Amino acid sequence: MIQIHALPAFNDNYIWLLQDLSSQQCAVVDPGDAKPVLGWLTEHPDYRLTDILITHHHNDHVGGVAELKQATRARVLGPAAETIPARDVALVDHDRLTVLGLEFVVHAVPGHTLGHIAFYHEDATTPLLFSGDTLFAAGCGRLFEGTPEQMHDSLERLAKLPDSTLIYCAHEYTLSNLRFAQAVEPDNQDIAQRLAEVIRWRSENRISLPSNLALEKRTNPFLRTRETSVKEKADERSSGQNTSQSAVFASLRAWKDKF
């Protein structure tokens, strides 16, 4: 049985830890800092870190890799198109890998960075997606390297996964993302309900993740570029007609950058 835990790091990062109760092995996703992981291992001395999964090269996702590799000899898997410290396995689109007995498929999702990847585990009841900084709860990552067209295509690809897919993204940005989503769609009751719920959770110091794809399709403006209300608001912000969904996305992303 696999349990998934969020290890907080820095101001708003989550390092996801997968714990295999049967084998007493574990894996982590995007350890920007080694300390939370080493602390967990100290508290669970019977567990061995076997794998480190990396979605992209930003330091808040890879900063702890070298120290963890040295301490545990864990296997490091990350995107082939980016420079990843201590990487053992270079991954490209459609690659398959097995971690703690779970098979994951690699999805290339350029936009936030050009080589960004996501890890998807297909399951009949609870599929899993570790989306890094591509798809957030109610939002998406900034475009540091890619184009709006690339990021929109990446999000559209992820949107084709099953609605039951659990979304494990790397940051606690949900509250600010929902406030932006409400500015885009002030009459969307799903957004209003989710915002109230997340406000309550955060006031109780609870995390807002994981999300799920069905909820994202109802409340994430970056997955709703087909919606008339979203396009109209994007047109209003850009003072013109956005003639494609990627143009609507670009308008929304530019607005969010200054929100």
Swiss-Prot record:
Compositional bias (Basic and acidic residues): 224-238
Record EC number: 3.1.2.6
Top-level taxonomic group: Bacteria
Binding site for Zn(2+) 1: 56, 58, 112, 133
Required co-factors: Zn(2+)
Molecular function GO labels: hydroxyacylglutathione hydrolase activity; metal ion binding
Record's keyword annotation contains Zinc: yes
Binding site for Zn(2+) 2: 60-61, 133, 171
Transmembrane segments: none
Keywords linked to the UniProt accession: Hydrolase, Metal-binding, Zinc
Reaction catalysis annotation: an S-(2-hydroxyacyl)glutathione + H2O = a 2-hydroxy carboxylate + glutathione + H(+)
GO-annotated biological processes: methylglyoxal catabolic process to D-lactate via S-lactoyl-glutathione
Pathway the protein acts in: Secondary metabolite metabolism; methylglyoxal degradation; (R)-lactate from methylglyoxal: step 2/2
Chain intervals for the UniProt region annotation (Disordered): 224-245
CDD domains membership: hydroxyacylglutathione_hydrolase_MBL-fold (cd07723)
InterPro entries from the UniProt entry: Clx_II_MBL, Glyoxalase_II_hydrolase, HAGH_C, Hydroxyacylglutathione_Hdrlase, Metallo-B-lactamas, RibonucZ/Hydroxyglut_hydro
Co-factor binding comment: Binds 2 Zn(2+) ions per subunit.
SUPFAM superfamilies found in the cross-reference section: Metallo-hydrolase/oxidoreductase
Family: Belongs to the metallo-beta-lactamase superfamily. Glyoxalase II family.
HAMAP family listed in its UniProt record: Glyoxalase_2 (MF_01374)
Role description: Thiolesterase that catalyzes the hydrolysis of S-D-lactoyl-glutathione to form glutathione and D-lactic acid.
NCBIfam families tied to this protein: GSH_gloB
Subunit structure: Monomer.
Protein name listed in UniProt: Hydroxyacylglutathione hydrolase
Natural source organism: Pseudomonas savastanoi pv. phaseolicola (strain 1448A / Race 6) (Pseudomonas syringae pv. phaseolicola (strain 1448A / Race 6))
Lineage: Bacteria, Pseudomonadati, Pseudomonadota, Gammaproteobacteria, Pseudomonadales
